[in-house]
């Protein structure tokens, strides 16, 4: 194990929107170190969101941020062994973990969609999540239901 926790390295903001959150998302979406490909997919997806949006006063990036906040879980369950039995204990999530979990879900459920390109898949999932629907939002709802169902075990906190 480490002697001390590793320092968080600062992320460079992305070139188009000058936003660190976008860079974090692109880094998670990137495969095989192909960052330029991941950036192209993200920017194309935001352009598609801009075309298909119903809300005229919001930009594609704002819709993406709304979608991200709609997917963010507030509680999660963690396994803990107590006297031979394993309990699912509901726990609050740290703010940085909320964001990274939401990003992971948005990316993974985008990849499972049936659109032609990854940009199309991501755009469709972002638009769905912004409207409080889609697989990523369903995952958040299921996680919250699981935490609610196991509320009785919350006194076993870590």
From Swiss-Prot:
InterPro entries with a match to the protein in the record: Ribosomal_uS7 (IPR000235), Ribosomal_uS7_bac/org-type (IPR005717), Ribosomal_uS7_CS (IPR020606), Ribosomal_uS7_dom (IPR023798), Ribosomal_uS7_dom_sf (IPR036823)
GO molecular function list: rRNA binding; structural constituent of ribosome; tRNA binding
Record flagged with keyword RNA-binding: yes
Any one GO BP annotation for this protein: translation
Keywords on record: Ribonucleoprotein, Ribosomal protein, RNA-binding, rRNA-binding, tRNA-binding
Pfam families referenced in this protein's UniProt entry, alphabetically: Ribosomal_S7
A cellular component term, taken from the record's GO annotations: small ribosomal subunit
Record function comment: One of the primary rRNA binding proteins, it binds directly to 16S rRNA where it nucleates assembly of the head domain of the 30S subunit. Is located at the subunit interface close to the decoding center, probably blocks exit of the E-site tRNA.
Protein family per UniProt: Belongs to the universal ribosomal protein uS7 family.
Subunit structure of this chain's protein: Part of the 30S ribosomal subunit. Contacts proteins S9 and S11.
Listed name of the protein: Small ribosomal subunit protein uS7
Gene designation per UniProt: rpsG
């Amino acid at each position: 194990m480490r002697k001390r926790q590793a320092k968080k390295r600062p992320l460079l903001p992305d070139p188009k929107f000058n936003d660190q959150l976008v860079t974090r998302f692109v880094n998670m979406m990137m495969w095989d170190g192909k960052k330029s490909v991941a950036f192209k997919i993200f920017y194309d997806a935001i352009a598609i969101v801009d075309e298909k949006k119903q809300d005229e006063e919001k930009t594609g990036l704002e819709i993406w941020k709304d979608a991200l906040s709609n997917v963010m879980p507030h509680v999660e369950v963690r396994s803990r062994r107590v006297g031979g039995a394993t309990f699912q204990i509901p726990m609050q999530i740290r703010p940085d973990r909320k964001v990274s979990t939401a990003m992971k879900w948005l990316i993974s459920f985008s990849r499972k969609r049936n659109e032609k390109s990854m940009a199309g898949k991501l755009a469709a999932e972002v638009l769905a999540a912004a409207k409080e629907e889609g697989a990523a939002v369903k995952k958040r709802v299921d996680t919250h239901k699981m935490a609610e169902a196991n509320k009785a075990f919350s006194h076993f906190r870590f």
